[in-house]
């Protein structure tokens, strides 16, 4: 197995800073250098302009992650109209010897660390991440003339979604114009779910559980409370409106009973991921986690829901890189209990094979274009934080809270770090999160203080010790999650010479109505509008006035629907009136809350 498990992925890229993300199987000191090219064409590597060094963070026995940022050498900055090259070198860590069998401080470079021996390359595709003979990745900054700006937009990406993985098409687009700075794609915005935590193919979960436990070097204890404990927890009155009817209690009383045998539920308070088999997790996700993806008679939507931290980590590695994929999945008849399940398994395995076959193209593409992502719902689970009832029913259960925290930690490491590397600088909240995550893993999931700190930095709301339910607090006329002040932000702004992109977070900045727990929320609170939209625009105006930028165009990425189709709106309004808010993500669009819609 090569040193690099996933990456390099070119992330936040500006004239004075370039960030590259990697996942390695062993600890390393990682050095990133950005070079000019002769004539700006990308063909011949010239002199280094930016340089940076960073150490990997150990998140598992065989999982070491880094987002290394290169800063200017002397007064060099990057400009438009030029193609730049970057290279990475790895220095052995004091914590372990070189993977390739050399001495402790033997250096490895990017090319030697990407791929295994040639004889093992059959399932990995082309052994290159470059479009040039020098075999190194390249990029170009957005142009000064907006007429030449090339932005690429992608949305959700589900491995077993059917059809070809469209992200692989980007590889052809870059290859066609690789040597033309103003014609090749300049930025990639992936504004949908980069993984699906809920809707997972059975063969994929089979691979993820094994890979996740191996990467961590330990098996997580997933908290499954027995039915009596859950009922007691959920039937506690909601503190904000004690006079109101208890929607959570009513929902619990009206729901179907768990399919899990009572004896087994009472006997096991904790289970390992491997004990929760592919295709069997829908009832567990609903009854022990409170999740809603499988409601409206769609158990298949959560039959292989991710639960463990290792599974969420491994999912990112498998959708971004071909390295950890097996050559072939076992046949359904050898895994499943009946013919129907076996047929589903074999169909999904074929879709997985099709998906993985083009991953080398995806890997090369995202190594050669600055890539930005958002925090969407399926990165955690369907309907994540949709309304107050969702928060109560999921965060009020140990398994639900654990899964949300696992998913958000994985998102922070694999996505947010590259979007906003400044948040992860030494002493910042992201750095504290990584330290806590490393401590949690080193303890094999037993360091409660580390896990509490992870929750704090991720903005997981506090729990009421009397009710076991998440706390809310009043913010002007709406309720917001009672989170710590020192939390990671998922929203960000990226500016170039003539344009900027403002990416909103409409999941964790919601304002929930005080009346009913199922009423549609404001997708951004009043403070959210100020922090995520007004402040960036004010900063841009100031930067334009000082001459540092000349922003002529502003793009805003709004994760949820701005305006829905009238027929969808009609169905969702009926669902809200009937209390069936999880039937159709009712209320997860801007036009459902008039004040927020007008303000936007």
What feature does the model see in each segment?
Residues 1-600:
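Extended recognition/assembly regions associated with phosphoester-bond processing machinery
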């Amino acid at each position: 197995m090569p040193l690099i498990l996933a990456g390099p992925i070119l992330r936040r890229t500006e004239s004075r800073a370039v960030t590259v993300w990697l996942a390695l199987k062993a600890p390393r000191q990682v050095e990133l250098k950005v070079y000019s090219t002769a004539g700006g064409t990308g063909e011949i590597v010239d002199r280094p302009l930016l340089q940076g060094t960073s150490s990997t963070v150990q998140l598992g026995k065989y999982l070491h992650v880094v987002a290394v940022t290169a800063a200017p050498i002397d007064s060099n900055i990057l400009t438009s109209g030029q193609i730049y090259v970057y290279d990475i070198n790895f220095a052995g860590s004091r914590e372990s010897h070189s993977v390739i069998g050399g001495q402790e401080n033997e250096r490895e470079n990017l090319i030697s660390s990407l791929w295994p021996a040639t004889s093992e390359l059959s399932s990995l595709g082309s052994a290159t991440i470059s479009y040039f003979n020098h075999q190194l990745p390249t990029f170009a900054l957005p142009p000064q003339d907006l007429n030449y700006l090339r932005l690429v937009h992608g949305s959700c990406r589900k491995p077993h979604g059917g059809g070809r993985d469209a992200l692989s098409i980007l590889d052809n687009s870059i290859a066609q114009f690789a040597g033309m700075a103003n014609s090749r794609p300049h930025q990639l915005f992936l504004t949908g779910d980069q993984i699906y935590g809920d809707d997972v193919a059975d063969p994929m979960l089979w691979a993820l559980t094994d890979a996740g436990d191996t990467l961590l070097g330990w098996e997580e204890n997933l908290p499954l409370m027995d039915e009596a404990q859950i009922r007691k927890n959920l039937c506690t009155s909601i503190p904000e409106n004690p006079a109101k009817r208890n929607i959570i209690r009513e929902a619990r009383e009206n729901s179907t009973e768990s399919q899990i045998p009572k004896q087994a539920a009472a006997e096991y308070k904790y289970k390992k991921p491997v004990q929760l088999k592919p295709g069997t997790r829908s009832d567990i996700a609903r009854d022990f986690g409170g999740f809603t993806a499988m409601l409206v008679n769609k158990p298949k939507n959560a039959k292989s829901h991710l639960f463990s931290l290792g599974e969420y980590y491994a999912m990112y590695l498998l959708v971004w890189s071909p390295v950890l994929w097996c050559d072939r999945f076992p046949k359904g008849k050898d895994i499943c209990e009946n013919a129907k399940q076996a047929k589903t398994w074999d169909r999904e395995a074929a879709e997985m094979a099709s998906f993985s076959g083009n991953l080398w193209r995806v890997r090369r593409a995202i190594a050669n274009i600055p890539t930005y992502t958002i925090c969407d719902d399926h990165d955690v689970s369907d309907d994540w934080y949709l309304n107050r009832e969702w928060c109560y029913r999921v965060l009020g259960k140990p398994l639900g809270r654990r899964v949300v925290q696992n998913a958000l930690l994985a998102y922070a490491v694999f996505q947010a770090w590259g979007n906003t590397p400044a948040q992860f600088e030494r002493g910042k909240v992201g750095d504290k999160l990584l330290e806590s995550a490393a401590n949690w893993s080193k303890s094999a999931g037993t360091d409660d203080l580390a896990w509490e700190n992870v929750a704090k930095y991720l903005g997981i709301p506090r729990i009421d010790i009397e009710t076991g339910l998440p706390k809310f607090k009043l913010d002007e006329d709406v309720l917001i999650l009672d989170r710590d002040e020192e939390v990671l932000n998922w929203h960000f702004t990226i500016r170039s010479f003539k344009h900027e992109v403002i990416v909103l977070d409409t999941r964790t900045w919601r304002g929930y109505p005080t009346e009913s727990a199922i009423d549609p929320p404001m997708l951004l609170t009043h403070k959210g509008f100020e922090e995520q939209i007004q402040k960036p625009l004010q900063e841009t105006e100031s930067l334009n006035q000082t001459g540092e930028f000349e922003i002529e165009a502003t793009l805003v990425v709004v994760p949820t629907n701005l305006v829905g189709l009238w027929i969808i709106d009609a169905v969702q309004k009926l669902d809200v009136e009937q209390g069936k808010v999880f039937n159709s993500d009712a209320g997860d669009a801007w036009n459902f809350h008039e004040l927020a819609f007008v303000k936007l």
